[in-house]
Regions:
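N-terminal, Lys/Arg- and Ser/Thr-rich interaction peptides
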Residues: 1-29
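Positively charged, aromatic-enriched nucleic acid-contacting surfaces
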Residues: 34-168
């Protein structure tokens, strides 16, 4: 888009890591994501306070969020979370609209993240064994195509690097 700045790439401390699947005795896969607060901060930083706005619309039972910069709107649909369905759906729609503006789009280049079970503690919740420890993105770098070229994730409790990736 001519005249509009490209949002900067995400810093390591702006990226959250959450367990997406756990296989007992083997390990867990981890997904990277950004929060809606990160989108708001980057919109403010890139375009200025008051230079952007957002709106929500319900279409066929789905909640859409649009973000406008200089009168140009980009929309996307949200998916509710299990915890707080409406708030989660609104937040998800906002983050997805942020992706449409290029905020955090580099996360789509994330490698598959697998952490072996010997790298984290587990606990039992409702009779089911689950990971107890949290994971943190501690280092991230990007190439000239805005793709992840280097990634390190550490166990927040032990501070041990539990995943490393270098793009060939």
């Amino acid at each position: 888009m001519e005249g509009l700045k490209t949002p900067r790439l995400l810093c390591a401390d702006e990226i959250e890591a959450r367990v997406s699947q756990y296989i007992e005795g083997k390990g867990c896969s981890v997904l990277l994501y950004k929060t809606a607060r990160v989108d708001m901060d980057i919109l403010d930083e890139t375009y200025g306070l008051g230079a952007w706005t957002n709106d929500y619309k319900e279409i066929k039972g789905n909640l859409y969020c649009g973000i406008a910069v200089n009168g140009i709107w980009k929309w996307d649909c949200g998916v509710g979370s299990n915890a707080e369905a409406q708030k989660g759906e609104a937040s998800d729609a906002f983050k997805r609209a942020g992706f449409r503006w290029g905020i955090g789009r580099e996360l789509y280049s994330s490698p598959f993240i697998w952490i072996p079970e010997n790298k984290f503690e587990t606990k039992v919740v409702k009779g089911k064994k689950v990971p107890k420890d949290r994971f943190i993105v501690c280092n991230i770098e990007y190439n000239e195509k805005r793709k992840i070229s280097y990634l390190q994730i550490k166990n927040a409790n032990s501070q041990e690097i539990v995943f490393s990736y270098v793009r060939a």
